[in-house]
């Protein structure tokens, strides 16, 4: 397969990003970009190779510094024809995302009704939710049986996630959405330099389209649309001990979205669980021998039958400096957030870690 490897492509992407917000162009010209061109080029090369390997439709990767909220690399490539991948600028394009699963668990922890060590019975991998069957990915192999909530998250068990929601919220799904709103999930609504970014969209109990099965599918990634940059913003807040800040493409004053998204003890518990995802769960392809990683895999099937496979996380796990999201759009199976997006995350993370002294000097 022939891949577009023109050396100036990553720099073209940077220029597109920096010029996209016309309403504030006069101000932006006076500010310096946060993008690191060297990292942008390297990330583009890694994505090109992975797209070629997977024959995927598109891929997006965003790298952000945890404390400064500066976006250091922002790359998106898509297949324009049967052979070539070219840069695009669909950073405002939203889709369903299974990366909400740890956020659902955080909301459950906030109620005080559950702990990560609590057991849930996933049975043989099929759970009846009114007139629909909720399945785990290994249902045809007999499911996971009884596992802890922490193990359920690491295994991406849909049943474990939803049963945790049942225990924490009972029949009050609106209480769950109230907590998501309190935690600022789906923010920000706009970022200077990213055109047409819209608020994340959720189907809630207040909507006419709400059904008695909507909650079960929402808490695992469906019945919503959210962009990768909005998802990364939340994971970056987890890495930043609960402080959510506005991602920036220009070096400007810090804007705090939420000074504390959740109780510190619950955030600390979730951070331990996200480490476990990588050391013992489906996130192991993101595991690095060079730096400790924490994060979560995600795989959803869209209405057209295609798949979104993702990995979002941060490193070093014990003292996070960078957060990264990788989102890949595939036409067909196999589709694995860990094996596909997690591997890209690892490659980018290791490159940053090896050149850590260089990036810290920026």
Map each language-model feature to its residues.
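Bacterial N-terminal signal peptides that target proteins for export
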Residues: 1-9
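Extracytoplasmic/periplasmic proteins that interact with beta-lactams or build/remodel peptidoglycan
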Residues: 1-2, 16, 21-60, 80-82, ...
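Bacterial N-terminal signal peptides
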Residues: 9-17
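Beta-lactam-recognizing serine transpeptidase/beta-lactamase-like catalytic domain environment
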Residues: 30, 35-39, 59-94, 106-328
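A helicase ATPase "motif cassette" and its flanking acidic/Ser/Thr-rich regulatory loops
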Residues: 43, 152, 345
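Short, conserved phosphate/pyrophosphate- and ester-handling motifs at nucleotide-, phospho-/glycolipid
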Residues: 101
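Short, gly/Ser/Thr-rich active-site loops of penicillin-recognizing serine hydrolases
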Residues: 255-258, 342-362
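A short acidic/glycine-rich loop-to-helix N-cap element
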Residues: 330-340
């Amino acid at each position: 397969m022939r891949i577009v490897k023109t050396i100036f492509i990553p720099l073209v992407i940077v220029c597109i990003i920096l010029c996209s917000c016309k309403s504030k162009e006069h101000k932006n010209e006076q500010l310096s970009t946060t993008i690191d061109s060297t990292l942008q080029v390297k990330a583009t090369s890694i994505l090109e190779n992975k797209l070629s390997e997977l024959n995927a439709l598109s891929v997006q990767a965003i790298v952000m510094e945890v404390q400064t909220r500066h976006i250091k690399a922002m790359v998106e490539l898509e297949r324009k024809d049967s052979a070539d991948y070219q840069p695009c600028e669909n950073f405002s394009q939203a889709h369903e995302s299974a990366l909400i699963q740890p956020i659902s668990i955080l909301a459950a922890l906030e109620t005080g009704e559950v702990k990560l060590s609590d057991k849930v019975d996933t049975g043989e991998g099929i759970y009846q939710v009114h007139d629909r069957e909720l399945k785990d990915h290994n249902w045809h192999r007999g499911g996971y049986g009884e596992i802890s909530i922490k193990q359920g998250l690491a295994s991406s068990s849909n049943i474990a996630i939803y049963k945790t929601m049942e225990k924490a919220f009972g029949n009050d799904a609106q209480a769950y959405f109230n907590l998501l709103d309190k935690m600022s999930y789906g923010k920000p609504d706009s970022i200077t330099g990213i055109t047409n970014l819209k608020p994340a969209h959720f189907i809630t109990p207040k909507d006419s389209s709400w059904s008695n099965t909507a909650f079960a599918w929402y808490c695992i990634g469906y019945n919503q649309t959210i962009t990768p940059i909005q998802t990364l913003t939340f994971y970056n807040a987890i890495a930043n001990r609960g402080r959510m800040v506005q991602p920036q493409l220009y070096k400007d004053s810090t804007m705090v979205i939420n000074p504390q998204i959740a109780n510190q003890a619950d955030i600390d518990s979730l951070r331990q669980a996200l480490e476990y995802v990588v050391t013992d769960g489906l996130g192991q392809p993101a595991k690095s021998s060079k730096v400790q990683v924490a994060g979560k895999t995600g795989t959803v099937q869209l209405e057209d039958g295609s798949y979104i496979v993702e990995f979002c996380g941060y490193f070093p796990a014990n003292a996070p400096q960078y957060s990264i999201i990788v989102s890949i759009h595939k036409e067909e199976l196999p589709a694995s957030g860990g094996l596909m997006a997690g591997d890209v995350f690892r490659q980018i993370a290791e490159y940053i870690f090896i050149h850590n002294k260089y990036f810290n000097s920026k």
